[in-house]
Design a protein with these regions (language model features):
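Conserved long alpha-helical elements within nucleotide-processing catalytic cores of c-di-GMP signaling
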Residues: 1-22, 29-59, 65-77, 81-89, ...
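PAS and PAS-like sensory/regulatory domains
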Residues: 8, 104-110, 175
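Residue-level signal for alpha-helix termini/capping positions
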Residues: 12-15, 100, 171
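PAS-family sensory domain
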Residues: 19-21, 62, 143, 172-175
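Sensory input modules used in signal transduction
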Residues: 25, 76, 114-116, 179
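Hydrophobic pocket-lining residues within nucleotide cofactor-binding pockets
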Residues: 28, 79, 117, 152, ...
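Cyclic nucleotide signaling catalytic output domains
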Residues: 64, 90, 94, 100, ...
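Active-site core of bacterial EAL-family cyclic-dinucleotide phosphodiesterase domains
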Residues: 158-187
Length: 187
């Protein structure tokens, strides 16, 4: 994809210049409700209007790409954590402004995860993965902007491993239910 090509180029440029870059992963809140309630045609119009709004909010050198459905990624060259957080907050705010489409007003929200190169990742693929992890952390709060941290990545991996182990234990009937009454000592 174009984003992957540009991300690859930006990583090489950052290496050559001893610089940095940020990748922002945006996921829309409440878009499914619009699609389900108003139809995919209106949903597509909302995405087009939002894409135009975000396009106007871009700064020189930035690249915005729709990843599918209601997800977007923004590549911000020569950006550290402060710049990336400011861009993330600005985009979440721009998305939250009501959109007029087909004579109706639609309110969306967004959650934003951010990964930084080279501090969070060794290459573009890892940068995308870490931005995705940070976005899911932000989505837990809705409307939040979160930087990737190794602790969040480790915590997510532990939760996924635990969920897999629980599914396996259920499938193999290794879990048993025990009734354990709880009483207060004061009673």
């Amino acid at each position: 994809s174009l984003l992957q090509e540009r991300l690859h180029e930006a990583v090489h440029r950052a290496d050559a210049e001893a610089g940095a870059l940020a990748l922002l992963y945006l996921d829309l809140d409440r878009f499914k409700e619009i699609n389900d309630g108003c139809g995919h045609g209106v949903g597509d119009q909302v995405l087009q209007a939002l894409g135009a709004r975000l396009g106007r909010a871009l700064q020189p050198g930035e690249l915005l790409a729709r990843m599918g459905g209601d997800e977007f990624m923004l590549l911000v060259p020569r950006a550290g954590s402060e710049t990336a957080m400011a861009r993330g907050r600005a985009l979440v705010e721009a998305i939250s402004e009501p959109l007029g489409v087909s004579g109706r007003s639609f309110s969306l929200g967004a959650s934003c995860g951010i990964s930084l190169y080279p501090s969070d990742a060794l290459d573009g693929a890892e940068l995308m993965k870490h931005a995705d992890i940070a976005m899911y952390e932000a989505k837990a709060v809705r409307g939040a902007v979160r930087l990737y941290s190794r602790e969040v990545g480790t915590s997510l991996n532990r939760r996924l491993l635990l969920a897999d182990r629980l599914k396996l234990a259920l499938a193999e009937r290794r879990l048993r239910l025990h009734y354990q009454p709880q009483i207060r000592l004061a009673d």
